[in-house]
Structures are given as C-alpha cells and as structure tokens.
Amino acid sequence: MRLQRERPQDAERLVTKIRGYEIALQDEAFAYVAHHYPDTFLISAKLLWKGISRTTPRFNAWSESWGGDDTLFNAAWVAENVQNKGPLGKVYPNADYLWEGDTPSFLYLVPNGLSDPNQPHWGSWGGRFTAEKVENILTGTGNDTVDPLLEQHRPYQMFSDAKDSWTHEEQEYNNEYATVFRWRRAFQNDFAARMNWSITEEFTKANHHPRVVFNGDASKSVVELKAKSGTSITLSAAGSSDPDGDSLAFRWWIYPEPTLANRSDDSLSQWTSWFSTLSGTETKLQLPKVATPTSYHVILEVEDSGSPSLFAYRRLIVQVMP
C-alpha cells in the first residue's frame, strides 16, 4: 500500500508481474487483492482441483469429481510408487480426504511443452480456466464462513474453472474436473519417476522425459504460424529423442476447448479426419475453409516406452486465414 501511495507507477508495473493461483477459495485473500489491484493476474481453482485424485473411502464425498483411471492415485498406488521409495517416500502421509489437493497449482507451472502459464484457457496439467476473468466468484460449496468474507470485497474478478469434454474407456465427461483428471496418467507417471530419481544416483536406473522437436524447433515454446484456408500443412516431430534410448509413441490431436474459446464450430467435431495420420513422426493437416481468421490448437503428445512411461508435448497454434 505504501508503494501505491508514494510511487503509483511502480506499483502498477509490479502488479502486472504478479501471478497467483489459489485452491478452493479457502479465505478472502485473493478477493481482497483482486478488488484493490484489479490488473493482478489471479487464478481461482474453485472446484476443478478435486479432479486430482479420488476421495478416500473414509471420506467418500464429491463423487461428481471422479473420473479417469482412479487406480493411478489410490492407497495401493501411493504405497508402491511413493511411500516405498526411500527416505522421502517414508514421510509421505496417508490421505484423510484426498491426495495432493493443492498440487494443481504446481502442475500448472510444469514446463512440459503443453501450456503457457500466461494463457489460463489453453489448458495444462493444472487444469483449464476461463479466457476472461469471472466476477465475484464464491466457493461453490456453500461455505458459510468464507463466502460472507468474499462478498465484503465486491467487486472483484479472477480467472476461474472452465470445462473440458473428454472420453475415457467409453465414459464421457464434460466438467471442470476433467481438465485435471484427463492428464492423471501423465502427471502420476511423472510423480513416480521423480520418486525413482530420489533413490538412485545412476542416470540409467531411472526413466526420463522425451525431448520433442517440432518442425525443427527443439524448445518447449508454443509454436504459432499462419496458413491459408483450405490448404494442407506438414507437421513433423523428426529429431525427437529419448535420453534413455526408449522408443517413442507420437499422437497428434486438436484440443477443442481452447480452439473454440468463445465461438462455435460444428466442423470441429470432425477434426480427426483432418490429419493424414494421428500417429507417427509426421502428419499432414488439412485446414478447414474459414471466412474469418480462425485459430486451431494442435497438440503433439509424445510418450516413451520406459517404466513408468513419461510424456512430453508441443503445442502449435495455427491461425487459418481466409
């Protein structure tokens, strides 16, 4: 507050650098900040954090948030892959409610090539959020302690939960929790691999992430390009490698929700037919015909054959021009 009074321009510049991600609106802190400093970049994982893992039998609530492969984060999985792995694993606690409820805030920042922390609506291991800030959000759980405190700070705005449509073993989901649990296999394998790293000094005794090259670019940055409506472009992962010499599986897909953002596009339901192949190191993408500039989010997902298998990604945003 002193900085704001004495050097308002510096205060404004500082605010633009702040990034915040909170879980479940457990207090009024973010509402206070958002009210007094409306330009602050704040994300509220209002409910989607529940998608990180299934609640324990002892608690057994929030069934609406269950989805994906729950065997990848239950007591048996934790015992085998975490608690049984060295001194760190020994101090890992059992869950009273659910495991890692706050971890989506960390997963949001993991630099795996999938996401950009400055673009909350693009989606990440830590969930996907709205493209625009939402006004005066409450806990969503009827918390009669926190909700009145939040209301004292109106008006305030934050990015908050968005929904993904995702299918797993013929079960269709369309909710905010799916923006997290759709990635469970990937982030749980990552967790298991890191525990393995903690118990060996030999590189060859643990698995490591693939290194993905996209159209000659070996960084983890999002690639953006423009292309003509109705034309075909070649997408290549040639040069991708694995530090352990594992074989690699390549998957090409379009992420519908960040592609659609605030528009509708019935043709997007046919996106699988736009690719010459959905696997392999190279594919051709037949671009749709558009009347106005339209962006499509293409994901290259690479999985190695190690144990546990590990994932890496690249994201291409193709702006299709009329």
Question: Which residue stretches match the model-derived regions?
Answer:
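N-terminal acidic, glycine/proline-rich low-complexity segments
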Residues: 1-234, 240-243, 247, 254-265
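Hydrophobic core residues within well-ordered beta-strands of beta-rich domains
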Residues: 233-234, 248, 296, 312
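Surface-exposed, flexible coil segments in extracellular/virion-facing regions
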Residues: 254-286
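Short, surface-exposed loop/turn segments at beta-strand-coil junctions that are enriched for proline
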Residues: 287-293
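Short, solvent-exposed loop/turn segments at the edges of extracellular beta-sandwich modules
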Residues: 303-309
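Extracellular and select intracellular beta-sandwich modules with Ser/Thr-enriched
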Residues: 309-316
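Short beta-strand edge segments in extracellular beta-sheet folds
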Residues: 317-321
